[in-house]
Design a protein with these regions (language model features):
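PRPP-associated nucleotide enzymes
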Residues: 1-155
Length: 155
């Protein structure tokens, strides 16, 4: 498995680039970060935009590196009044298969927001979701700087 290790500086630069893209065409009301991987990018985006309306959802799909459940399990949800009629920026670290993003986006859309757009630091060609905003496009397994330990130490 090919691995791409991203350093803090590269991720921060990517988030700034993504924010420049977002500023051009999307004036969102609420940021929703997907736990765990999307939380750091979501917090960073909230500071860059000075948008304190940051919510989180938890969805679990991967059990371990390359090991998935049958489908994503959404274990922490939102209240309808938090997103009703609002423009949502859904943030995650990576659109890998895209299955988690689809499940979370469909859940949010069921709460009647005005619009939901997706921002991810990295996207893979196999993803069934084409994010509205992304910077890195790769088919490699990505290790972000906030992740516990490199793949080699997990075996």
């Amino acid at each position: 498995m090919d691995i791409l290790y991203l350093e803090w500086s590269k991720v921060d630069e990517a988030i700034w680039t993504m924010c420049d893209l977002i500023k051009k065409d999307y004036d969102f009301d609420v940021i929703v970060g997907i736990s765990r991987g999307g939380l750091i990018p979501a917090v960073r985006i909230s500071h860059i935009f000075d948008n304190k309306r940051l919510l989180l959802m938890e969805a679990k799909y991967y059990k371990d590196i390359g090991v998935r459940d049958d489908k994503p399990q959404i274990t922490l949800t939102l209240k309808k009044e938090d997103v009703l009629g609002k423009k949502i920026l859904l943030v995650d670290d990576v659109a890998d298969t895209g299955v988690t993003l689809v499940a979370v986006k469909e859940y949010i859309e069921g709460l009647s927001p005005k619009e939901v757009r997706v921002a991810v630091v990295a996207s893979k060609p196999i993803s069934i979701v084409k994010p509205d905003y992304t910077v890195f496009n790769t088919d490699k397994w990505i290790i972000f700087p906030w992740e516990k330990m490199p793949v080699e130490k997990r075996k």
